[in-house]
Amino acid sequence: MKDFNDIETIDFAETGCSFTREAIASGGYYQALKTPTCKEISGRRYKGTNTPDAVRDLWSTPREVIAYLEGRYGKYDLDAAASEENKVCEKFYSQETNCLKRWWGKNKHVWLNPPYSRPDIFVKKAIEQMEHNNQIDMLLPADNSTAWFTEARQNAAEIIWIEADLTEDIDGNEYARSGRLAFISGETGKAVDGNNKGSVIFIMRELKEGEVQQTHYIPITSICPSVKNKRAKVRKVD
């Protein structure tokens, strides 16, 4: 304890905290490091996202989704928003070649998994390009509270909702596997669970005469069979 008759000694308990605050406030040496630009997380895409901005739009589609859709509708002629590393067919448009400024052709089967930070403009482009007798299979978050979702739904020939997988054992116990896709990280190249939304696929093409829009509800295990290898969780509803 400091002797109050001692006017020479400095008591750090009294002055240290204010010294530290002043040093930091003045921009001194001991400053908190800024987050590297490549790691910044703004949350502009969805509230609660933990994905750095630099790779937020670089997620790749699980290849089982592509295999399912090609088995159902035929091979793809064009990947409208891809890179050399994650393209699903030989012809693709990258960020540099920009599908938004191009004609996608005629009578083509097109895959589109657009950047989720700005889906509106890609939905409008798909609607424009399907008028050339193209079919555009567009994967989007299952967020029907948005204007772009409504616009896609209004113009789609088919809508595929990817659902959870539910099973029941002989004793009546229910088990579930999440219907949320595990996208491939642009940062690590590995599939990542914990997607914060479900997914929906809009089949964008003009309806034939007499045809009406169809809506399908497909369990994730029918689209991505490897999900069956994941342990199902007991479903408790009480």
Curated annotation (Swiss-Prot):
Protein name listed in UniProt: DNA N-6-adenine-methyltransferase
Family under the similarity heading: Belongs to the N(4)/N(6)-methyltransferase family.
Domain of life: Viruses
GO BP, sorted A to Z: DNA restriction-modification system; methylation; symbiont-mediated evasion of host restriction-modification system; symbiont-mediated suppression of host innate immune response
Induction: Expressed early in the viral replication cycle.
Function, as annotated: Methyltransferase that methylates adenine residues in the dsDNA sequence 5'-GATC-3'. May prevent degradation of viral DNA by the host restriction-modification antiviral defense system.
Lineage, uppermost ranks: Viruses, Duplodnaviria, Heunggongvirae, Uroviricota, Caudoviricetes
EC class of the enzyme, as a word: transferase
